[in-house]
UniProtKB/Swiss-Prot annotation:
This is Peptide deformylase 1. The keyword Metal-binding applies. Binds 1 Fe(2+) ion. It comes from the Bacteria. Its cofactor is Fe(2+). Fe cation binds at residues 91, 133, 137. GO terms for biological process: co-translational protein modification; translation. It is an enzyme of class 3 (hydrolase). The active site is at residue 134. Removes the formyl group from the N-terminal Met of newly synthesized proteins. Requires at least a dipeptide for an efficient rate of reaction. N-terminal L-methionine is a prerequisite for activity but the enzyme has broad specificity at other positions. InterPro entries: Peptide_deformylase, Peptide_deformylase_sf. Belongs to the polypeptide deformylase family.
């Protein structure tokens, strides 16, 4: 397993459309690396393969307090959603910036688990929001895309400042 570099906006690799995984067995190391990378962050709850420069349609999520209950979603799709509300989001690829985004509070997601078994997850509240956020990455979308141009500029200023501080 390896901790991978998390890309930050405006890296063009974050905008790449993910490719469907056809052989789940072939991506087990990537799944492990995504989980290890997620667990190395201070406050991350989800990570998508494009955030580490990979094109596979894979998302990992762990909302548990002890970070020991990973949810692995391969080729996930939101098939339905209801009850939109505004809620604050952040992103490991847009560090140090948080903003209100409108999302469904209840969703149905279909995916494969890490063993290739079909999943259909009906969930609400925070997990529903995180799933939508991470699945957006698979289409090359960031949460700041839902914001006004002014707020997008503010977000990018924060990211540039974060990257300068990190480079020191």
């Amino acid at each position: 397993m390896a901790v991978l570099e998390i890309l930050t906006a405006p890296d063009p690799r974050l905008r790449v459309q993910s490719k469907e995984v056809t052989d789940v067995a072939a991506v087990q190391t990537l799944i492990d690396d995504l989980l290890e990378t997620l667990y190395e962050t201070d406050n991350g709850v989800g990570l998508a393969a494009p955030q580490v420069g990979r094109e596979e349609a894979i998302v990992v999520i762990d909302l548990s307090e002890n970070r020991d209950e990973p949810l692995v979603l391969v080729n996930p799709k939101v098939v339905s959603g209801s009850n939109k509300e505004m809620g604050q989001e952040g992103c490991l690829s847009v560090p140090d910036y948080y903003a209100d985004v409108e999302r469904y509070t209840s969703v149905v997601v279909e995916a494969l688990d890490r063993n290739g078994k079909e999943l259909r997850i009906e969930t609400s509240e925070f997990l529903a929001i995180v799933m939508q956020h991470e699945i957006d990455h698979l289409s090359g979308n960031l949460f700041i895309d839902y914001l006004s141009p002014l707020k997008q500029q503010m977000a990018m200023k924060k990211v540039k400042k974060h990257n300068k501080l990190r480079a020191r």
